[in-house]
A protein has these predicted regions:
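Catalytic adenosine-cofactor/nucleotide-binding cores of aminoacyl-tRNA synthetases and other
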Residues: 8-96, 194-213, 217-233
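Short hydrophobic "helix-edge" motifs at membrane interfaces and signal-peptide entry regions
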Residues: 25-26, 110-113, 170-172
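Short, charged/polar, low-complexity loop and linker segments
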Residues: 52-58, 109-117
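Conserved, charged catalytic cores of large soluble enzymes
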Residues: 76-115, 135, 139-154
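Basic, alpha-helical terminal appendages of large translation-related enzymes
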Residues: 53, 117, 122-123, 132-238
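Secondary-structure capping and boundary motifs in well-ordered enzyme cores
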Residues: 19, 30-31, 60-71, 96-107, ...
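Beta-strand segments within the central parallel beta-sheet cores of soluble alpha/beta enzyme folds
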Residues: 3-6, 188-190
């Protein structure tokens, strides 16, 4: 072979797993406890490829809740809920302003450039970090624009803000598919993105939004993407 990948050790609370220590964990059990996507995200986010890495139930729950549930999942939930409730699910023609264009650029740079470039280098944790910073930027934009307040003071501006968030969610979901394929696929379905329009090449299609609204697509009230994880009883007892 021209290239051989060397994986580091996966440590259980900082210790190598062995039968003599009685700390060997079945990965299938972890997947059942936390979900495959959350487990994949933790391992790729937390551990630099090729290096040793440590895991614990507490670490998985903390990372998944902080970044998937509270940040990415909450962003999707708030955005789609407000569109369904305040716009009756109808998106309409998009006319972005300065702050909106700035967020679009931030997310596009992360999802279309930084993330795939780092994955090409096998720097998975670095790529996910770039993606996560884009998620944080989106949540900061929500807090600054306060669409719930704009509903009373400037409904048209509220619409633009929600449209912007809808658009960036599509890039975020497409980009993170290699890490959390099930959940990102579910989000793309809620966004009305066809299964044959979810590749990295599709992100560059600037006409997708206009084509979507031309179909009369309406955003439905969303189902939670990442319910908060709880500590398994077995882990709490150990």
């Amino acid at each position: 072979p021209k290239q051989v990948y060397g994986h580091g050790f996966l440590l259980n609370r900082g210790q190598k797993e062995s039968k003599s220590l009685g700390n060997v964990t079945d990965p299938n059990v972890l997947a059942e406890q936390f979900g495959v996507d959350a487990l994949r995200y933790f391992l790729m986010r937390e551990i630099a490829f090729g290096q040793d890495g440590s895991y614990s139930a507490e670490a998985i729950v903390t990372r998944a809740n902080a970044e998937l549930a509270n940040s990415f999942g909450n962003l999707a939930q708030r955005t789609l809920s407000m569109i369904a409730k305040n716009l009756d699910g109808v998106l309409g023609e998009y006319r972005p302003e300065g702050d909106d264009k700035a967020l679009l650029t931030t997310v596009q740079d992360a999802c279309r450039e930084a993330f795939p470039e780092q994955f090409e280098k096998l720097a998975f944790s670095v790529g996910i970090d770039a993606w996560m910073k884009a998620v944080y930027a989106c949540n900061q934009y929500v807090d600054e624009q306060a669409p719930w307040a704009l509903k009373k003071t400037d409904p048209e501006r509220m619409r633009t803000v929600l449209q912007t968030l809808f658009i960036v969610l599509r890039d975020l979901a497409i980009a993170i598919q290699p890490v959390i394929p099930e959940k990102s696929g579910h989000l793309l379905t809620m966004l009305g993105i066809a299964e044959d329009a979810r590749t990295y090449e599709d992100m560059a299609d600037e006409g997708w939004y206009g084509a979507l609204i031309a179909t009369g697509y309406r955003v439905e009230p969303p189902t939670p993407l990442f319910p908060r994880l709880e500590m398994p009883e077995t882990a709490e007892a150990s």
